[in-house]
């Protein structure tokens, strides 16, 4: 997958909606043979809606990856859909922070309650890029320190963020 990503970065135009991150759609059929056994063991039999190869160059603030189900599946709306992260490479320390709060809105909104959660200094350091408004609407962060080869999965409705990796010298 690293070779594929390197080739895409060198030769293909990234998705405009995800710039400045380098993000490329990949047909699941091209990677199904390698990914299907991993996904099946992690989630059970599942349908893959989207595959992206990405090089993230700015920290992601608090958001979720929820997209409403379409008519192309036999799943009922509300059935869990998972985001699965397969870290390929980073040039330094990286974390994904997952919160228990869920929403069908892409980021915390006025409709989401203020939690009153008191973040530790370590959590605050990891999330210096997240606006206070969003921080007030999430709680109890699960911090996942990852490296190449890991597999991390969470419900797409859960709010999550990257750490502020630039603060500790990681550029992607």
Labelled PLM ranges:
Residues 1-64:
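Non-heme Fe(II)/2-oxoglutarate
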Residues 58-151, 155-157, 163-164, 168-172:
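Catalytic core of non-heme Fe(II) oxygenases with the double-stranded beta-helix
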């Amino acid at each position: 997958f690293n070779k594929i990503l390197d080739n895409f970065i060198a030769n293909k135009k990234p998705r405009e909606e995800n710039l400045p991150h380098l993000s490329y759609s990949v047909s699941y059929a091209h990677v199904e043979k390698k990914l299907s056994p991993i996904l099946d063991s992690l989630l059970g039999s599942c349908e893959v809606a989207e595959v992206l190869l990405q090089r993230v160059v700015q920290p992601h603030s608090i958001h979720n990856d929820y997209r409403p189900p379409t008519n192309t599946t036999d799943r009922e709306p509300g059935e869990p859909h998972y985001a699965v992260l397969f870290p390929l490479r980073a040039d330094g320390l990286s974390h994904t922070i997952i919160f228990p709060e869920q929403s069908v809105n892409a980021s915390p909104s006025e409709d989401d309650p203020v939690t009153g959660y008191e973040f530790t200094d370590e959590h605050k350091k990891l999330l210096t890029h997240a606006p206070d408004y969003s921080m007030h609407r999430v709680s109890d962060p699960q911090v996942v320190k990852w490296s190449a080869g890991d597999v991390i999965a969470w419900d797409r409705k859960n709010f999550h963020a990257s750490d502020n990796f630039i603060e500790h010298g990681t550029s992607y």
